[in-house]
Amino acid sequence: MKMNKSILMLMLGATLLGSCDIERFPTYSMSDEQIKNNPASNLDALLNGMYAQLKSWSDPMHRCGEYAGDNMVIRGSSTDAFFEFISYSRTPNNYRLQSFWDSGYKAIAQASNIINMIDEGQSTEIDNSLGECYYVRGMMYFYLCRAYGRPYYQAPEKNLGVPIVNGTPDNILDLQLDDRATVQQTYEQAINDLKKAELLLSTNRGPAYASKAAAQAMLSRIYLYMSGTYENPNREYAQLAVDYSNKVIENSDYSLLPCEEFMKYNTIVPENNPEDIFVVKRVASEYSGYDHYYGIGGMYSNIGGMGWAEMYASEKYIDLLNETGRNDWRPASKKIVDARANFIEPTYTEDNKEVFRFVYVGSDGKKHYAQFDTKHNGDKVSCTDMNGNSYDLTLVSADDEYYTINYNGTEYQGMIDNYIELNREYPQFYIVKCSREGEDSQLHSPVISRLGEIYLNRAEAYAKLGEYDKALTDLNTIRNRSIVNGGYPAGKLNADNAFELIDKERQLELAYQAERSYDVFRNGHSLTRDYPGPHNQHEEVKASDYRVTYYIPQNAINAYPGTLTQNPTDNSGVILK
């Protein structure tokens, strides 16, 4: 019996993905003969199916990228599989990682299906559609490899990336697939696909669809990931990161939002946002009832009664926002110093009760928040704890209302503020960067590439090339957009502080876009989370730690037609050079 290639690709996808049910693949799959006879009329449906896979993929993509970083804090331990991302307690039986793997390979399978069935050169429109497929496939290989593979500077020719499966093998009934490609080979596949996309893409249909600029933006990031560390840079790849960044920055289709508009960035629908290059587009009709609880923003806030609101901005991130001056979120005296602080919304109580908030080290050796009621007596300020003990406060900054307190024999600095509602012991600093897109809800289209990132990519690449003046110009472009006169003075950036200053800006700018943990480890640095929260506050996760990579899902290994090697289960198996 002869099977058409579409069915074979579905079989291949189901075999590769393990837990996926063939019946769950889109019903609009059609035979290769139908497609080849009339490609123009069928391509839209096929492309829609490919893009649809990104919607389910983007949820675990965000969680495994963002939760492993230091921008957020969870209210307490959780039985949800995502808590493993926060706690670094890696296991191979994590359903969210399974979903990330499955959805990623579904997108790869559907993109490959279209590429293999339709010939190039029939028309500009068809070539553009093929370019979209190459973009999605290349992007997906990169995202999968950065989660399941080691940072590129660590022996990429030895460490394993992910399996490369770009079409239907000739012998589908006796299928044997190759083991995981190396990190180097996986990156090469992603680069080749994205360069092919760049060549074929000629029409910009907006940020919900792949475009030439989207391919160039992703190449900018990939080459940055390949550019080594600040201490040992790879100049060839750093220059390529600059080259591809130039192509995007010089494209008149895109521009940075001015400060006032950027403060509302999360509310602007992507098609009206000149900064967005590629997003995973979501629309309100995809959500009904309690669906908003389960969106990305639903863990960060409660909007309109929807959302779990169990994760908040970390003390570390709040301190970074306040570094150039206090951001005052109180309704009666609101003053945003750093535009990015507008994506944070503390849940003040309605009575506007004044407190002195600070972080202290408890008898358990961990950091905790305290909010003590204040009392004013002329120009003197004191506060009272829950046991009725009174403490005099010493003024540090009248403008910012910063004071110090001697508490349990140690001096701590804090601020006068209104009382913020607690979830367990943590003030609810809601994160709304992933909410309110076009409406007051949890609607959000996850951002894959935007222009702000590209300036920072180029800044880092310039720094690794030793061109610090050019790096500073790009760095200040982003700082001055968010902070009035926030740019560093000429000559400030140098070899000694380049990582610190550029990494800090990437954290501020790209927070809650699933970039943070990867940014830390790819440059050979450690992740520390020395701030209040239920996580291990004293742990240093080094870039050499085996937990930097996620485990391959066990279901995928069990169902794989061939050997699918698992990642190391302890540090002894990590290859660094």
Language model regions located:
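Aromatic-residue-lined binding/catalytic grooves and analogous aromatic/hydrophobic interfacial grooves
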Residues: 201, 213-261, 276, 290-292, ...
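Short coil/turn linking the two alpha-helices of tandem helical-hairpin repeats
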Residues: 122, 145-152, 205, 222-234, ...
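Sec-dependent bacterial lipoprotein signal peptides
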Residues: 1-18
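Conserved, well-structured interaction surfaces
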Residues: 82-149, 177-186, 194-205, 440-446, ...
